[in-house]
Structure formats: structure tokens, C-alpha cells
């Protein structure tokens, strides 16, 4: 069991409240984040049978109900008290660690069963890939990657007229105050700390809220 003080990190510098708040209050408490007790099994499992790999890209196209029987999804804390979002979102995941990509893909497919998820291990190919494919609804970025870091990618995306409104979520071990301030400066919308062991409902609320805020800006 992780510490109850472990929370998802926004790019804002939070002061946790004196008393824990429920996830229903999650986005109504501006400037604060809830304390969460989490215990999620994130051991790597078998790669889903419907994935196919070419060069550094793995695409997950089919709904989660086509997962092979031996593929397990992370355990939720308590009852499964969330309703999956059935939107056909397109998510791009960027991390030089393939295990981290598989873990995050598995979680997102549980929350968004009809999502189209693409994994990229090579951060140098991200901008060219974004320019050559249909638009994505959100990009999940590792920060510490060789050659091109997540912060540099975020900065370049925000400088692009075609990509500047693309929702960006960081998933990283670097979550000190100065790190979060830098992520905010380069335009990252939200930051999750690693290990990525948050209750499903919290992840769903965060991603939905980030997407909704960006859509409202259009």
C-alpha cells in the first residue's frame, strides 16, 4: 500500500487540504488536490494479441473486450465505481521504456475501451508522426527521454500552429515543485507521477477534464 499522501500531480503547485476530499470534489477545489490511498497492481503482463508492431510504433486498435484471456488489467481499489468512457479517442503515448507504455496502454483501454492508442518509443519521431497522421485527442509524455525530452516536445508542440491546442499530459518520476513549474511553462496540461498507480476513477476524471478544457478553448 502506498502512502495516503501520494497524489496525482497537476502542473499547478498544490497545497494539499487538511482533510481528504472525495473525487466528486476533485475539480471544484481550485488550487488543491485530494489525498489518495492507492494500491494498484501494475506488473507487466502479456502483450495484447491484437497489437502489431512496426519499427518503434505499437498500435492498439481494437476495444478492450478483445483482450486475450491471459491479459490482466490493474486491480482497482475497492469496487469498480467508474463508468468507462466509450468515446473513440485517439491517444499517443511517448516513453522510451516499453514496459511503461504497456502499463499505461492497459489502463487507458480499461477506461476508454474504444480508444485508438499508439505507442512511440522514439521521441525524435514524435513531431513527424503527429504531422503525418490524423489528429490525436491527447498525448501522454514521459519527461526523461534520450535526445528529445518530454518538455522539449511539449514546447515544440505548443509552438506549432496546427498542434498548439493538443492536450498534453506528462507521466514522470520528476515531480518536484521546480519540475512542475517548468512543465506548466512549456504548456503541459497535467502531470502524473510515476509509478502510475492511481485509482481508475481519478485517472478518468483527470483525462476527461483535460480534454474538456482544451475543447472549450476552441
Swiss-Prot record:
- Is Transport there in the keyword field? no
Function, as annotated: Required for stress adaptation, morphogenesis and virulence.
Protein species of origin:
Meyerozyma guilliermondii (strain ATCC 6260 / CBS 566 / DSM 6381 / JCM 1539 / NBRC 10279 / NRRL Y-324) (Yeast)
The record's CDD domains line, in alphabetical order, gives: REC_hyHK_CKI1_RcsC-like (cd17546)
GO biological processes: filamentous growth of a population of unicellular organisms in response to biotic stimulus; phosphorelay signal transduction system; positive regulation of filamentous growth of a population of unicellular organisms in response to biotic stimulus
- Cystine pairs annotated here are none
* 4-aspartylphosphate: residues carrying this PTM: 142
Q: What is this protein called?
A: Stress response regulator protein 1
Q: Which domain of life is it from?
A: Eukaryota
- Describe the location of the Response regulatory domain by residue ranges: 90-209
Chain's gene name: SRR1
Record SMART domains: REC
Q: Which UniProt keywords apply?
A: Phosphoprotein
